[in-house]
A protein has these predicted regions:
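Short active-site oxyanion
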Residues: 32-34, 59, 91-92, 186-187, ...
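Active-site-proximal loop/helix segment associated with metal-binding centers of metalloenzymes
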Residues: 109-110, 131-184
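Active-site neighborhood of divalent metal-dependent phosphoester bond hydrolases
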Residues: 98-122
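Active-site metal-binding motif and surrounding structural segment of the metallo-beta-lactamase
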Residues: 43-96, 208-215
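Active-site metal-binding loops of divalent metal-dependent hydrolases
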Residues: 8-10, 38-41, 66, 98-100, ...
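Active-site regions of enzymes building and remodeling cell-envelope glycoconjugates
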Residues: 123-127, 138, 261-268
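Conserved beta-strand hairpin/beta-sheet module of binuclear metal-dependent hydrolase folds
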Residues: 2-51, 171, 175-190
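Cap/insert and terminal regions of metallo-dependent hydrolase folds
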Residues: 66-73, 79, 168-177, 181-269
Length: 277
């Protein structure tokens, strides 16, 4: 599997690419290509063009969850496909938890997708997945994450609307991740980890049956985090003994320093290319 970072909060020296506070990764695996999230804007299109990546050739877009910094780029992708006359008969799969495109609010401000999922039906085929979904033989969408650790994934972020139209606390149940399975272990890729980074890793291990974690890449939702939670998260990763962690996006410097005492931390930024056999 090859992973290229198209959107992150940071970019690297001498890459001359554009960063924004969001997530978008391009994946190549098993003869297929994917986008994992789409960032806030059209930045991912700009960066993909510079890196020689043709996003019109992707097989699927995978949405980690419905927040705006992961979904708003979908509108720009649809506009781009329209401009290049992408055939509407060859629809791109749009894989997400069923709740991902429900309205989301924080302090009366919309923080969810800027259009309902049906608005993208010209170019995308919606795949609602609450359970595990095989993207390829070796790449899995985890669906709704089990939350068993009592120190994470327990608090709502604003409000959402349920299937009956009632406003409820948003525990971001749509937050998911993907996992690459290989002969030497698993690679876990996250968006924001609102469900809890340790919960995600635990669930990936449960679903795959493989405790050999090669890498965890993405947002860990460790931003202005209490020291007690950081300590428990660091202890978890120390016990996990993963080969490498690539914390980024919603992971602040304090969290990275804490994690560095427990695991091998690697740099992430727009333009980074990671290869896993």
């Amino acid at each position: 599997m090859q992973l290229t970072v198209l959107v992150d909060n940071n970019t690297l020296i001498d890459k001359y690419l554009t960063a924004e506070p969001g997530v978008c990764y391009h994946l190549r695996i098993d003869g297929k290509t994917f986008l994992f999230d789409t960032g806030y804007s059209d930045v991912f299109l700009h960066n993909a063009a510079i890196l020689g990546i043709d996003v019109s050739k992707i097989d699927s877009v995978i949405i980690s969850h419905g927040h705006n910094d992961h979904t708003w780029g979908l509108t720009h992708l649809a506009q781009y496909l329209d401009r290049i006359n992408h055939p509407s008969t060859k629809k791109i799969k749009l894989v997400a938890h069923p709740n991902a495109f429900q309205p989301k609010y924080h302090e009366d401000k919309s923080i969810g997708a800027n259009l309902p999922a049906d608005s993208y039906s010209t170019f995308f085929e919606r795949v609602n997945q609450k359970g595990v979904y095989h993207l390829t033989d070796n790449l899995l969408f985890l669906g709704e994450i089990e939350r068993n650790n009592n120190f994470e994934g327990r608090y709502p972020i604003g409000k959402t609307v349920d299937c009956c139209g009632h406003e409820i606390d948003d525990f971001v149940l749509d937050d998911s991740a993907i996992v690459y399975t290989s002969p030497t272990g698993i690679v876990i890729i996250t968006g924001c980890s609102h469900s809890g980074i340790c919960n995600i890793v635990d669930y990936a291990i449960k679903i795959t049956g493989d405790k050999r974690v090669r890498a965890v890449i993405g947002g860990f939702h460790l931003l202005n985090t209490e020291t007690s939670i950081l300590n428990r998260t660091s202890h978890y990763f120390q016990q996990l003994n993963a080969e490498a962690l690539y914390p980024c996006h919603c992971t602040d410097l304090k969290a990275k320093i804490a994690l560095a005492s427990a695991a091998n931390i690697e740099e992430v930024g727009v333009g980074v290319v990671l290869n896993f056999k």
